Amino acid sequence: MTFPALSVLDLVPVRSDQRTGDALAASRSLARTADAAGYTRYWVAEHHNMPAVAATNPPVLIAILAGATARIRLGSGGVMLPNHAPLVVAEQFALLEAAFPGRIDLGIGRAPGSDPVTSWALRHGAGGVDDDAVARFPSYVDNVIAMMSPGGVGLQV
């Protein structure tokens, strides 16, 4: 009998009686348990301005979890690409892959990942308001792929 590959999706929940550091410790423990149990992948999400969720920065969480585990693949489920410069996403995940070869997965999404005010703050903080970021999602994906390819960069602007 063949069993399906098992994965975990972690939002890093912060309970009402819990500090964020305790929630991160619980996620590290869960990742270690999933790794030891033979799970295939551990996904972390990206959500902003939600006090009950500590998963605001997938690359940072992935680095924390990769340092606490030995085998399990770690990925973003996903990075909300309209909120980030494609170059930054490509660099972050290339660096993670270099540090933890064969264990890093980049999952991306085009949703804002938050309420409109928070989405505006994320994009405005990156150097300007970009109301067309979601519409340009396909070109952002192409740019990330190009920047992560061994042949170099061919940006679409």
Put a short name on every predicted segment:
Residues M1-I72:
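N-terminal beta1-alpha1-beta2 module of alpha/beta enzyme domains
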Residues T2-T20, N83-G152:
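Flexible, glycine-rich active-site loops centered on histidine and acidic residues
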Residues Y42, L74, I104-L106:
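Hydrophobic residues within beta-strands of alpha/beta enzymes
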Residues A45, G77, G107-G109:
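Structural motif
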Residues A54-P58, P82, V89:
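Generic structural signal for well-ordered secondary structure
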Residues G75-N83:
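The substrate-binding groove and active-site-proximal loops of carbohydrate-active enzymes
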Residues V153-V157:
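Short, intrinsically disordered, charge-balanced linker/junction segments flanking boundaries
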